[in-house]
């Protein structure tokens, strides 16, 4: 069952596009980079969410939470693209990435991205580092349930048509195409040993269904809108943001340019 959909990021995209039209040469590269990142993120999350919803929207065994942003007390937000909560109290964190021209993973575990016209791929931060951060923050949020040491599996999902150059030595099994993740999901969750499932269930109160857990995590959600606008000196409801949004660019154009 779907407990939370993706946040609507299009108002922020529209504001940034209007800002881009008004920006001077010193600000344009920053805004263009932010828009590229947002477009790619929206495209990847939307594609993965559609696939997840198609298979799990009617499930009574798995709760689905899209686009969950948790901010711990010490700061430093964790953006979880997709969280799956199985009835066995097993959790899946799915990090979606969009690479239009392909991804290379080296034998040392480094990630490199191909760009249009590039002769060599460029290095990017490891998504595994992001996932490790997300797991840590999620475990803190799960502590009130007695589930801070529950099994948490992590996967990096790419578009079904993505080109992946895999290494021979480094284990890249956690990087897969979005249309392949259900096989991993079914093998990992529904075939869990009975003693493991019972042990996880016994650590939670009977009243804490997967829906209860999902809803309590959703109550901790803090949207990223304010942070995005603040990087450009705007408040979400301030006069500058409203002025930039007066003549927003078409929404379709904001996504169609995803790279």
Listing of model-derived features with the role each one plays in the protein:
Residues 1-79, 86-90, 115-259:
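Surface-exposed interaction regions that form or flank ligand-binding interfaces
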Residues 85-113:
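Active-site beta-strand-loop-beta-strand hairpin of nuclease catalytic cores
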